[in-house]
Curated annotation (Swiss-Prot):
Domain of life of the organism encoding this protein: Eukaryota
RRM domain residues: 193-271
Gene source species: Drosophila sechellia (Fruit fly)
Function, in words: RNA-binding component of the eukaryotic translation initiation factor 3 (eIF-3) complex, which is involved in protein synthesis of a specialized repertoire of mRNAs and, together with other initiation factors, stimulates binding of mRNA and methionyl-tRNAi to the 40S ribosome. The eIF-3 complex specifically targets and initiates translation of a subset of mRNAs involved in cell proliferation. This subunit can bind 18S rRNA.
GO biological process per UniProt: formation of cytoplasmic translation initiation complex
Protein's name according to its UniProt entry: Eukaryotic translation initiation factor 3 subunit G-2
Gene name in the database record: eIF3g2
PANTHER family: EUKARYOTIC TRANSLATION INITIATION FACTOR 3 SUBUNIT G
Family: Belongs to the eIF-3 subunit G family.
Subunit structure as annotated in this protein's UniProt entry: Component of the eukaryotic translation initiation factor 3 (eIF-3) complex. The eIF-3 complex interacts with pix.
Keyword Protein biosynthesis on entry: yes
């Protein structure tokens, strides 16, 4: 009596008793079909059919050369492409390649030396607030602003003639007197907003003096007295502020302030003949 094979598993067992049949593949249109055989967890033979869609892509030359590498070791006899038994196909990861010009522009923008990211909130200097030398002292920007407001109010009370309105030159002090002693060199000099800073160290420079007074208010000029021979500071300087209230604020803030291991003495400059 002739026996009939009723399933593909029986056909496989009849032809390959001691092992699994080899996998096979064929291409039909834009699809590739791969048939494989393996044992499942229960020890039974199963047939797996994979379907792949063929797509043509333009890849870099380095990728094309890498795909033509000759396989070695146990995969020497494998066909081109990944082997499902030794390679696990993961999700595709897309990478964005930035050109050298774009990288240089981004790098220069981040490291632009002209843009200083550090700004002190105490004295508005080009350093971090934790490193500010005036932190916790009377030179705090908040204290300076309050002092300037108080000094401006006091200056307005002490000098009621300064109401902010325009005053013609001939109505100012000495404006209508011809041949006055104010005519000449001393006529253009106004010492009402000048202060004298004394008890300065010998190593004091114009740059240090500029850093000391610039946060209080704008000034028109300043003079640092120096020795003729050595060039060292004599210990005092004059600063002419643009506004009288700023000069009053400088006296209130800097007078008695410690600077370079010395206590500063700041007062109104006496009128010079």
């Amino acid at each position: 009596m002739k026996s009939f094979v009723t399933s593909w598993a029986d056909e496989v067992d009849a032809d390959y008793v001691d092992g699994l049949p080899p996998s096979n593949e064929y291409i039909k249109g834009d699809y590739k079909y791969v048939t494989e055989y393996k044992f499942n967890d229960d020890g039974k033979k199963v047939k797996v059919v994979r379907t792949f869609k063929i797509e043509k892509q333009i890849v870099p030359k380095a990728v094309a050369r890498r795909r033509n590498w000759v396989k070695f070791g146990d995969s020497r006899s494998d066909k081109p492409g990944p082997n499902s038994q030794t390679t696990m196909a993961s999700e595709e990861i897309l990478m964005q390649f930035i050109g050298s010009k774009e990288f240089d522009q981004t790098h220069e923008t981040q490291l632009d030396p002209g843009k200083n990211i550090a700004k002190c909130r105490i004295c508005n200097g080009e350093h971090w607030s934790v490193n500010c030398p005036y932190k916790g002292t009377s030179m705090d920007s908040k204290t300076v602003m309050e002092t300037k407001a108080n000094a401006a109010a006091a200056a307005a009370i002490s000098d009621p003639s300064k109401t902010g309105k325009y005053v013609p030159p001939f109505m100012k002090d000495g404006g209508g007197i011809s041949g006055s002693k104010n005519w000449g060199r001393g006529r253009d000099r106004d010492d009402s907003s000048a202060v004298r800073i004394s008890n300065l160290s010998e190593s004091m420079t114009e740059t240090d003096l500029e850093e000391l007074v610039k946060k209080i208010g704008p000034h028109t000029k300043m003079y640092l007295a120096r020795e003729k021979n050595s060039g060292l500071c004599k210990g005092f300087a004059y600063v002419h502020f643009k506004f009288r209230q700023d000069a009053a604020a400088a006296i209130e803030v800097l007078n008695g302030h410690g600077y370079d291991h010395l206590i500063l003495c700041v007062e109104w400059s006496k009128p010079q003949p």
